[in-house]
């Protein structure tokens, strides 16, 4: 057997709300790579909404989510996937506990998360999700594939600002946190080939030094470095590890599901954030947190923020 891991992020650019980095880990037959996994599971998983039919869609979150389209397809894919791991979330907090439990410990420091909860899923009928999980389970079993993990790293504003300062740039921080998350899943695996596919981090083409920092026991070999993809390999013959950083990596199923997990948790975080401020500032319009609108929102809440003595450090991401 071999292992496929994919990572992707959501919330890299906003000033409000957390950065989400997610990874998914799969066990596959030796001859199935990241590019082939969609085809291998095509009877139960679709890569686009266009021809999905009754199948579960797993794709770049930007292709299946928009404010108008809603959370339905994110929830269908995530609930079916989490069902393979023994999770059946019924509330907002259940979702965090299943995918990013460490985030729950940080939430009491931010008033918009204190005591917040809501039913989940919010865009799907629960009755339709159990059959999806069962269908996915049967499809994975027939293909000799197992989903082993869906894990997210949540970087809230205060930690985000600190890590950017420590690393010297937002891009370097993203790369290091992504590789740390990937390593946390890889290090527990038994012998077997491990292929990791990561969406490229902005304009970065060179990741060798960062991989050497994270996997310091091994000599990292550079196989390709360019604008479209960068490939590295290391480790002993019985546990060879490959990292491929590439543009449009969501065409690989493990990355697509990671993209969906990151986007969904980001939307859940902003749901609580907006609910808090809208309850306290009359006529306030919600925000997605991106720079231009974030400045409008920040000005609109300034008086209430001051009255509530909420420090900018837990609210505003500097970059």
Predicted segments — roles?
Residues 1-319:
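RNase H-like, Mg2+-dependent phosphodiesterase core
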């Amino acid at each position: 057997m071999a292992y496929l891991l994919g990572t992707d992020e959501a919330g890299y650019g906003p000033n409000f709300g957390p950065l989400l980095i997610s990874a998914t880990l799969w066990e596959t037959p030796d001859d199935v790579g990241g590019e082939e996994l969609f085809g291998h599971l095509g009877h139960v998983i679709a890569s686009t909404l266009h021809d999905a039919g009754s199948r579960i869609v797993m794709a770049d979150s930007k292709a299946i989510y928009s404010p108008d389209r809603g959370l339905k397809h994110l929830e269908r894919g995530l609930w079916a996937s989490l069902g393979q791991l023994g999770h059946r979330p019924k509330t907002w907090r259940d979702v965090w506990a299943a995918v990013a439990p460490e985030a729950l410990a940080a939430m009491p420091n931010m008033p918009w998360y204190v005591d917040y909860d809501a039913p989940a899923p919010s865009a799907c009928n629960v009755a339709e999700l159990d059959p999806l999980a069962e269908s996915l389970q049967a499809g994975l079993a027939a293909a000799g594939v197992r989903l082993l993990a869906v894990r997210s790293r949540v970087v809230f504003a205060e930690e985000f600002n600190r890590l950017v300062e420590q690393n010297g740039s937002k891009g370097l921080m993203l790369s290091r946190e992504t590789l740390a998350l990937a390593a946390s899943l890889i290090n527990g695996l038994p012998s077997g080939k491990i292929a990791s596919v990561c969406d490229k981090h902005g304009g970065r083409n060179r990741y060798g030094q960062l991989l050497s920092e994270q996997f310091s026991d091994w000599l990292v070999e550079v196989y390709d470095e360019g604008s479209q993809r960068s490939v590295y390999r290391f480790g002993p013959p019985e546990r060879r590890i490959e990292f491929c950083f590439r543009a449009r990596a969501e065409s690989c199923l493990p990355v697509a599901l990671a993209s969906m997990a990151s986007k969904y948790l980001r939307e859940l975080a902003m749901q609580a954030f907006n609910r808090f401020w809208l309850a306290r500032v009359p006529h306030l319009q919600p925000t997605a947190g991106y720079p231009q609108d974030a400045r409008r929102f920040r000005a609109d809440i300034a008086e209430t923020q001051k009255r509530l003595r909420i420090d900018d450090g837990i609210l505003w991401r500097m970059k």
